[in-house]
Amino acid sequence: GMQVRGDAEEIELSRWDKLVELNITAVFELSQLAARQMIPRGGGKIINVASMLSFFGGFRCSPYAASKGAVAQLTKACSNEWAGKGINVNAIAPGYMDTPLNTTIINDPERNREITLRIPAHRWGLPEDLKGTVIYLASGAADYVSGAIIPIDGGYLGR
């Protein structure tokens, strides 16, 4: 995915369009392609990447929050359509993750400290923190799980 930060009234529409194309249109197209292959085979698993910003609006990142909210709703809508065809559609919703998308915030000592103090786990997530949930959702253990948006955020949303 990508991020566009700034005051909502100042964000150029071209930046909005690029972010929406990558963060939601591509997810929809890939889901369609996957479903077209899975339906004749009797099912499968689709795991989307939403965000903790699927649950709240964030600050100075309105295009990103809107697109990740759309991923969550698309996940639920596709689950409603495809669960009866054997396709489980779910999403993980990472919280603050130590990835290049957040380099600016991570490198700002004050902002980094503020965020870390709000995370009950007292640390940023790492990409490897996502794998257990993804493995679960892809496994037979999750055959009755569909339409779920699962936060992986060190407890942030539980506050």
Task: Give residue ranges: language-model regions.
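Short, flexible catalytic-loop segment of classical short-chain dehydrogenase/reductase
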Residues: 55, 72, 93-104
